[in-house]
Amino acid sequence: MKPEERIVKARMKNSNNWIKGYYIYDSTNKKHFIYLLDNSAIKNELTEIDETTLCYFIGLKDKNKIPIYSNDIVIIDNEPDYEYFIVEWNTDLARFVLNGDTYMVDFDNYNSTDCEVIGNKVGYPEYDFLNKHIWSI
């Protein structure tokens, strides 16, 4: 795997700001960090993250050349039904898949350039994209 394919993104701890870099877990202090990339706001520095927002780059880009991460919400251009898909890791298949509300597909069935990233489910915890409604709290 190339180094650029190991990139993750997450929100900074106690912030809504997203950062990208390399994931590091400090097992002694039980803290999660990202070693920031040069193009980040803060350069070459460890920044603590909210581990619940951690998203892994899957090594592919969408039709707009946007990197695709786990937990991204995508639509597929050539789908007859307008459906949202969530990019998720499937342990049984040992690969990232597109999980929709009616079916699941993998990137063997679709070219990533047929997909468009429209958001990330981490950014919209109150919205159930697969069932297309606001969760009642």
Model-derived regions: residue spans:
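Secondary-structure transition motif
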Residues: 1-137
